[in-house]
Amino acid sequence: HGWAVRPTLRLALFSGVFSLTGSQETSMTDQPTIAIAQINPTVGDIAANVELIRAARAQAQDLGCDLVMTGELAVSGYPPEDLVLKKSFQDAVKKAVLGLAKLTSDGGPGLLISAPWVDDAHLYNAALLLDGGKIKAVVPKCVLPNYGVFDEKRLFTPGDQPGAVNFRGIKLGIMTCEDMWGADVAQTLMKDGAEVLLVLNGSPFELDKSHMRIDLARERAHETGLPLVYANQVGGQDELVFDGGSFVINESGDLKVQFPVFESRVEAVSFGWDNDILAPKPGLMVDALDENEAIYKALVLGLRDYVNKNYFPGVMIGLSGGVDSAITAAVAVDALGADRVHCVMMPSPYTSKESLEDAAEAAKLLGVKLDTIAIQPAMEAFEGLLREQFVQHPADTTEENIQARSRGLILMAMSNKFGYMVVSTGNKSEMSVGYATLYGDMCGGYNVLKDVYKTRVYQLCAWRNANHTDGLMGPTGMAVPER
């Protein structure tokens, strides 16, 4: 790259940034290039996460990039919750970060990563700049979210307002996720001479969230006159789904790069100088998904990662002949493939002929194994066990719920025997009004539709029957029977 070399030796703590350098520092060219590593880390699997970062850096090195940036807490996985309070975990994270720092001694791209970081007995959610074989700077997150699914104030110490960090001749304004949501941190970085804002994120998927992120980034760009690079993680972690959708805007708020959602991607972003302003060049631009496609792909990714990251061989679903279990099975096949989805139809004496036909048709369309286990013997056994206790009480919902609980018992027994995780099928409309049976149709380790209203269920069925896109492992064409 024809970089100039100048010796540096400094150890300083300024404005919430720990700067630790003691090696020769290279300068970026007039056309600096930053690679965004939109990767899918796993909470607690430090070795696998480090390998993802290594692979992203190798790819960026082939592209001639100067710096690689990841999402929030990419080393530990996000959100790590109480795992970060264990000293053994903190030590393992530190060892991993030092190993990644050593990787940068080859003169290739620097790394801007994120990890739980202990300093002076304080635990920070920190961005770390690695270059020349060293940790060049540690930038703690200032604004810790404490609402909804976030409880970072319980775990981390907030950092002070940060200063800009010099990287190969360019002053970086480094922020982590919530730091960007208000004006203060970006303004402080601008006043300290930052020439570009780099934001590392662990921002989960919600409808219209991508527009909110871009709008906030535009506000920061307009306020500071600086370009902004937004790197978000992708993947499922327990009940959360991270959609990625990383992007770059220029100092005027114009969108110059837009990553895809729900898929891992490493892409180089090139910059040039325009009247002393670092200007991102137009790059990858991916169109936004419509609502139903976005929701469907979020469901697929969430289930896929929950199953794979917890090492389940597959899933088991009670197929009733209804729309909820049919779309759940379709999502499961699109996430895992038909060979990892085992469906069970469990008819009672009251199950309609149409339900039996629809369950069989759903299994046929998806190519999944379907067992049929009649629950009448279980119902009669339970009713016989309880007959003496119920003798003076007329039949009511108790007997109806025995049907659901018999099915739950069968599914959980098969799960125990074969190791497949049971996926429950109730939707958000049912859950919100209590239309479900405890220890019956609520049995399961994961519920695909827990945040999907019934009206949306029908929309997702229509979308899936009309569409098949990259990343879906199920069949093309109709996936949910229509009646």
Regions found by a protein language model. Give the residues of each.
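Enzyme catalytic cores with a strong preference for nitrogen-chemistry domains
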Residues: 20-318, 329-338, 345, 370
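Extended, hydrophobic alpha-helical segments in both membrane/secreted and soluble proteins
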Residues: 53, 298, 302-370, 378-382, ...
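Active-site adenylate/phosphate-handling loop in enzymes that bind or generate adenylated species
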Residues: 141-145, 150-162, 169, 191, ...
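Short acidic (Asp/Glu) and glycine-rich catalytic loops that position anionic groups and cofactors
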Residues: 199-200, 277-282, 337-342, 359, ...
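Acidic/polar loop patches that form or flank catalytic/metal-binding clefts of enzymes
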Residues: 230, 256, 422-424, 458-459, ...
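A conserved beta-strand->alpha-helix junction
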Residues: 263-270, 340-345, 353-398, 404, ...
